[in-house]
Amino acid sequence: MSCLDIIADYGLRSIGLGERLLPRSDFTLCHQFTLIGSGMIWNIYFGTLALTSGFILATLLALGKASKKLYLRKLSGWFIFIFRGSPLFIQFFFAYFLFLSLKQSFTFLSPLTSAWAGALFVLFCNTAAYSGEIFYGALQAIPKSDLEAADAYGMSGFSRFRRIVWPTMLRLAWPAYTNEAIFLFHATTLVFFSSFPAWQQRGDALY
């Protein structure tokens, strides 16, 4: 069997396409790299979706924590505190058993007991909390002269946020935010050691 045949048979195995049984003999380097690459499909799925959706929530959390309204500051602060103050691995276990309990009363929540939705939700909340704190720090570090210049030009509200505050916040937060993005992709491997059942995981364990 050539390496191209191995890739065709096992390249998409992690998402349920191709050969289901692992090879029992002649386990070559091509087999190993193909199976590792197949598993990375899920890492890319979790990392990309959690990062893009978490970015939006992180921006809202940063704005909420910097808001003059007390309830927004408290809600944002507690959300960030809970997800930054507890280990991600514990969050996976807690969320899984919480979703199992809720599924009995709310059947539409049943997808959250699977890794593709439930683990993604946990990663989404976790990266949003960490990124939200990073963005909040960047908001506090925006030079007052930039805001005064925006006021001098007559900018206010959303216009000032879109043209001055948001770009400056991203520029200041970018180094720390890229570190968080790298950490998130590393953390996606924890999904397969958590309680959330993933495709092929049970079959491989029996095999």
Regions found by a protein language model. Name each.
Residues 1-207:
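Transmembrane alpha-helices and adjacent helix-loop boundaries
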